[in-house]
């Protein structure tokens, strides 16, 4: 991961044998409550926000969404995924959890100027997305509770 504030690059090992590389067509996307669901650009445009039709972010959903932009070569991303899976289960009836493979969805990453991974979007039903780069799972829970669920 990269810490732009401190101008440092951190390399952290992970077990490549644990990496699951998924290829998903637009018609194969199935989003389930309580899961961290892989999505494509097509799904994003249809159900989250169609940036081709509006420059202002207009969320299409009826439940808050957490979107993880990740890559298989990103150690911090790979360690974050199990934490997000736990959060997806914990908030299964309140928040939808999605993940976007940054290597496969370059256009989507480019549209949002994603320059560091992991980058996580927290999208409330009403309002602008909250974007976090490299924060801790505890910070994510705080954002979900205070911003998305307004607890």
Place the predicted regions along the sequence by residue:
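Structural microenvironment flanking redox-active thiols in thiol-disulfide oxidoreductases
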Residues: 87-111, 136-143
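Short pre-active-site segment immediately N-terminal to redox-active cysteine/selenocysteine motifs
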Residues: 62-65, 69-73, 116
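Non-catalytic, surface beta->alpha helical segment in thiol-disulfide oxidoreductase systems
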Residues: 3-23, 27, 116, 121-151
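C-type cytochrome heme c attachment motif
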Residues: 72-79, 119
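Sec-exported extracytoplasmic/periplasmic mature domains
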Residues: 48-53, 89-92, 145, 149
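A short beta-strand-turn-helix
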Residues: 39-65
């Amino acid at each position: 991961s990269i810490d732009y504030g401190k101008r440092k690059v951190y390399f952290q090992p992970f077990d490549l044998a644990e990496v699951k590389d998924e290829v998903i067509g637009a018609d194969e996307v199935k989003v389930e409550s309580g899961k961290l669901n892989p999505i494509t650009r097509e799904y994003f445009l249809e159900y989250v926000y169609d940036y081709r039709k509006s420059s202002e972010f207009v969320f299409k959903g009826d439940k808050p969404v957490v979107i993880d932009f990740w890559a298989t070569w990103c150690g911090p991303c790979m360690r974050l995924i199990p934490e997000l899976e736990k959060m997806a289960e914990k908030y299964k009836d309140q928040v939808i959890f999605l993940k976007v493979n940054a290597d496969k969805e370059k256009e989507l990453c480019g549209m949002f100027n994603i320059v560091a991974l992991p980058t996580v979007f927290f999208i409330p039903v009403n309002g602008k997305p909250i974007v976090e780069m490299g924060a801790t799972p505890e910070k994510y829970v705080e954002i979900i509770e205070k911003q998305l669920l307004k607890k």
